[in-house]
UniProtKB/Swiss-Prot annotation:
Gene Ontology CC annotations of this record: plasma membrane
Family per similarity comment: Belongs to the ATP-dependent AMP-binding enzyme family.
UniProt key word Nucleus: no
Designated name of the protein: Probable long-chain-fatty-acid--AMP ligase FadD30
Disulfide links within the chain: none
The species this protein was found in: Mycobacterium bovis (strain ATCC BAA-935 / AF2122/97)
Pathway stated in the Swiss-Prot or TrEMBL entry: Lipid metabolism; fatty acid biosynthesis
Function of the molecule: Catalyzes the activation of long-chain fatty acids as acyl-adenylates (acyl-AMP), which are then transferred to a multifunctional polyketide synthase (PKS) for further chain extension.
Gene: fadD30
UniProt keyword terms in alphabetical order: ATP-binding, Fatty acid metabolism, Ligase, Lipid metabolism, Nucleotide-binding
Lineage: Bacteria, Bacillati, Actinomycetota, Actinomycetes, Mycobacteriales
EC category name: ligase
């Protein structure tokens, strides 16, 4: 069934069941809750659809509706309403006066949006953003909360059943060149099926599905859209949404919502697990229990084994089951999901000899190993999405334990980027494997840009190809370096290289607090921190640090999904725009 036919079925068979709930914290009048049943949601969706259908059709292309609105139920109605009208929705961030506003404006321009859907609250900012960053000032901007309820059903169900039915998911990387991944409804339904098969333990032949979903992830992000919209829609359970800002202001809210709802499914990036551990008090959790939690995905950025260990230890007194926490791997080019740990099993990790990893092959650490790297263990089988390790230069499939690029094959994989050069899309999305193993299709394969290796039915991720740091001919993975630095600084870290006359130099930038208090440092500590970090990187990694910066909290540039952007850090460093809290001799 398509997304919209599933929604209409829910509105018909369970019209009064709660569908979407939005928790709006910290408003001027206190916390507020906005609720919609399935029938109410369908009415809102058809109101949006009726308005868009009134614009008519383009003869040669599908109309696009960019959505740039605050997190909430209007965002949900806007996305589904565009699909319902046979349009292509384009989920984007709400303009908030930050660097990401440029990305939003450029995306509106790139997708040639016929309209921009927003709310009355954000309308002025949206108009200013699209005018400033090159989109036509005549592009209609529609406040979703002002649309009248329609009479009759205004959904174009025929368009939902064709491969033409699609949306654009802009990746969270480059601000200067946002890329819209073209995703069909077939891609989505395949990925939902893959998620159900791989995340939920099967009992008696049926998956143990969640009874609710809890999400604070932004709906414009690939994981936020899957967890906050597609999963509850296809599973048929209520979703409790809140905003990323509400989580950041009080991370304990995430755990409290999980405790208060039945068998919940949820997801967040690795940094959120660290925040939940650091910022959730005993008072916050008083009287609460997490023993009923179905699944918590850790994804969207490199999963750190230490984070998983600390998270499980912190919430063990509240009966959180280790098997409920699921380290995961995915990307927007494949909707979102690619792999996770084995269903029903707790997350595990393995220690490898770091020197062998630097030389391009994996060897287990032993008592003689001088330096070990611990990596999360993911499960790999012969079901889609298929995963293989390939030499990125020769396109030859690599054997067990050899480090190469991770390639993906499956019906959830996009056909390419919108408005991209044909050669780029062929190289990225239609790659062919040479000397493929038995049972391995020759093509098409998605080049992920990630490095990893396979051992048996397990695979491991070591980092991004573009972030690889090479010093004295040896490969070093920034995640490994950053983990070492965090042991001394406590905050977020970026390890990146800069080139000077063809020579690569390692730079470390670490966020620290300067006030007194737990996990904070004083000015007198800075030189000590630098000495310890430089010494550790030399002894443990064999690395020479050219420059070491301590910067204020929040100073390191991030992508729209909250990940540290090493490329942006390097660019700001080169322009001398990274703010330092201390200068070292």
């Amino acid at each position: 069934m398509s997304v919209i036919s599933t929604l209409r079925d829910r509105a018909t068979t369970t019209p009064s069941d709660e569908a979407f709930v939005f928790m709006d914290y910290d408003t001027k009048t206190g916390d507020q809750i906005d609720r919609m049943t399935w029938s109410q949601l369908y009415s809102r969706v058809t109101a949006v659809s009726a308005y868009l259908i009134s614009y008519g059709r383009h003869a040669d292309r599908r109309r696009t509706a960019a959505i740039s609105a605050p997190q909430g139920l209007d965002y949900v109605a806007g996305f589904l309403g565009a699909l319902c009208a046979g349009w292509a929705p384009v989920p984007l961030p709400e303009p908030l006066g930050s660097l990401r506003d440029k990305r939003t404006g450029l995306a509106v321009l790139d997708c040639a949006a016929d309209v921009v859907l927003t709310t009355s609250q954000a309308e002025t900012r949206v108009r200013a953003t699209i005018a400033t960053h090159g989109a036509s000032v005549t592009t209609p901007v529609i406040a979703l909360d002002t649309l009248d309820e329609p009479s009759g059903d205004n959904c174009d169900l025929d368009s939902q059943l064709s491969d033409w039915s699609s949306y654009l998911q802009y990746t969270s990387g480059s601000t200067a060149n946002p890329r819209g991944v073209v995703l069909s409804m077939r891609n989505v339904t395949e990925n939902v099926d893959q998620i159900i098969r791989n995340y939920f333990r099967h009992e008696g032949g049926a998956p143990r599905l969640p009874s609710s979903v809890v999400s604070w992830l932004p709906l414009y992000h690939d994981m936020g859209l899957m967890v906050g919209l597609f999963i509850p829609l296809f599973v048929g359970c209520p979703v409790i949404l809140t905003s990323p800002e509400a989580f950041i202001r009080k991370p304990a809210r995430w755990m409290q919502l999980l405790a208060k709802h039945q068998a919940p499914f949820s997801a967040a990036p690795n940094f959120a697990f660290d925040l939940a551990v650091a910022k959730t008090s005993e008072e916050d959790m008083a009287g609460l229990d997490l023993g009923h939690v179905n699944t918590i995905i850790n994804g969207a950025e490199q999963v750190q084994p230490n984070t998983i260990t600390k998270f499980l230890r912190r919430f063990r007194p509240y009966n959180l089951m280790p098997a409920a926490v699921k380290p995961s791997y995915g990307m927007a080019e494949a909707v979102v999901y690619l792999a996770t740990t084995k269903a029903g099993s707790p997350p595990t990790s393995t220690e490898f000899d770091a020197d062998s990893l630097a030389r391009g092959h994996a060897e287990l650490s032993t008592f003689e190993t001088e330096r070990a790297t611990r990596l999360i263990r993911y499960h790999s089988d012969d079901k889609e999405p298929l995963l293989r390790i390939v030499d990125p230069d020769s396109n030859i499939e690599l054997g067990p334990g050899r480090i190469g690029e991770i390639w993906i094959h499956g019906k959830n994989v996009s056909t390419g980027y919108h408005n991209a050069d044909d050669a780029l899309n062929r190289d990225k999305f239609q790659a062919s494997i040479r000397e493929a193993s038995a049972g391995t299709p020759r093509s098409p394969w998605l080049r992920t840009g990630d490095l990893g290796f396979i051992v048996g039915d397990e695979f491991y991720i070591v980092g991004r190809m573009k972030d690889l740091i090479i010093q004295d001919g040896v490969n070093h993975y920034p995640d490994d370096i950053e983990t070492t630095v965090k042991e001394f600084t406590g905050g977020r870290v970026a390890a990146f290289s800069v080139s000077d006359d063809g020579v690569e130099h390692l730079v470390i930038a670490a966020e620290v607090r300067t006030e007194h208090g737990p996990d904070k440092v004083t000015i007198m500590d800075f030189s000590t921190i630098k000495r310890l970090v430089v010494s550790a990187l030399s002894k443990l990694h064999g690395l020479h640090v050219t420059d070491f910066l301590l910067v204020p909290p929040g100073a390191l540039p991030k992508t729209t999904s909250g990940k540290i952007s090493r490329a942006a850090c390097a660019k700001q460093y080169g322009a001398n725009k990274l703010q330092r809290v201390a200068t070292f001799p």
